[in-house]
From Swiss-Prot:
The active site is at residues 11, 89. It is an enzyme of class 5 (isomerase). It comes from Blochmanniella pennsylvanica (strain BPEN). This is 2,3-bisphosphoglycerate-dependent phosphoglycerate mutase. Catalyzes the interconversion of 2-phosphoglycerate and 3-phosphoglycerate. GO terms for biological process: gluconeogenesis; glycolytic process. GO terms for molecular function: phosphoglycerate mutase activity. Keywords: Gluconeogenesis, Glycolysis, Isomerase. The record marks 185 as: Transition state stabilizer. Its EC number is 5.4.2.11. Disulfide bonds: none annotated. Homodimer. InterPro entries: His_Pase_superF_clade-1, His_PPase_superfam, PG/BPGM_mutase_AS, Phosphogly_mut1.
C-alpha cells in the first residue's frame, strides 16, 4: 500500500512559553530552548530519512523560525513554503500577554481551563483601538477582511478557519503523494488533530501538543488516515 506522510510540529518553546504567558497572535520569538528543540526535531527527521516536497507555516515568527531551523538541519532550505494566518495560534483575546498564574488568580482555575481546553468557550475579547495586540493594527493582516480577523477565539472558531485551508491548500498535495511538513501552533494543530482523528469535545480537551516534537500522520492513496505517531 502506498503511504503518504505528513509531519505536524508545534513550534519550539517561545519566550512567552518560557515566561508562562498567554501568547495567541502576539509575535513572540523562540527561546534558546525552543531553538534547540527545533534543531533536535530536524535531526530526528533527518535520521528517519524524511524528504519534503512542500512546507506550511503560520505568519508568526516562532513557527517560521522553527521551520527554518528544521529545514537547515535537513539541508532543505530551498523547500517551497506557504505562510498563512489561518495556521496561526488560537487568538486568546484579552488574555494575551497575561501570566497564566496571575490569570488563574483573577478568573479562577476552572474558568481558565475551560478557556484553554474546551471546544467552544471563548475568552473575553481584546479591546482598545490602539492595542498593539489587535490584528487590525498589524500590517501582515492588511489584505484580510476585518470580518475574518478575530478578537478572541475558541478552539471551534480556530478549527473553522484552519480546516477550510487544510481542504483547499494542503490535502491536494497529500492526494498527489507528496510529503508535507506543517509547523504551526498548539491549538491550530489541535484543530487538525480533532478533524483527522474525529475526536469529540471531551476527547480534544485531553489533547496537549508538545513543543518541537514531530507528529507523523500516514495516509493511503485516497488521503484517508492510516495511523499517527510521535517521533522522539
Amino acid at each position: 500500500m502506498h503511504i503518504t506522510k505528513l509531519v505536524l510540529i508545534r513550534h519550539g518553546e517561545s519566550q512567552w512559553n518560557k515566561e508562562n504567558r498567554f501568547t495567541g497572535w502576539v509575535d513572540v520569538d523562540l527561546s534558546e530552548k525552543g531553538r534547540s528543540e527545533a534543531q533536535c526535531a530536524g535531526r530526528i527527521l533527518k535520521k528517519n530519512g524524511f524528504f519534503f516536497n512542500y512546507g506550511y507555516t503560520s505568519v508568526l515568527k516562532r513557527a517560521i523560525h522553527t521551520l527554518w531551523i528544521i529545514l537547515d538541519q535537513l539541508d532543505q532550505a530551498w523547500l517551497p513554503i506557504e505562510k498563512s494566518w489561518r495556521l496561526n495560534e488560537r487568538h486568546y483575546g484579552a488574555l494575551q500577554g497575561l501570566n497564566k498564574d496571575e490569570a488563574i488568580k483573577e478568573y479562577g482555575y476552572k474558568t481558565i481551563q475551560k478557556w484553554r481546553r474546551s471546544f467552544n468557550v471563548i475568552p473575553p475579547n481584546i479591546c482598545g483601538g490602539n492595542n498593539q495586540f489587535i490584528a487590525t493594527n498589524d500590517n501582515r493582516y492588511a489584505n484580510i477582511s476585518t470580518d475574518e480577523l478575530p478578537s478572541s477565539e475558541s478552539l471551534e472558531l480556530t478549527l473553522k478557519r484552519v480546516i477550510p485551508y487544510w481542504n483547499q491548500s494542503i490535502i491536494p498535495h497529500i492526494k498527489k503523494g507528496q510529503t508535507i511538513i506543517i509547523v504551526a501552533h498548539g491549538n491550530s494543530i489541535r484543530a487538525i488533530i480533532k478533524f483527522l482523528n474525529h475526536l469529540n469535545e471531551s476527547e480534544i480537551f485531553q489533547i496537549n501538543v508538545p513543543t518541537g516534537v514531530p507528529l507523523i500522520y500516514e495516509f493511503d492513496k485516497k488521503a484517508n488516515t492510516v495511523q499517527h505517531y510521535y517521533l522522539k
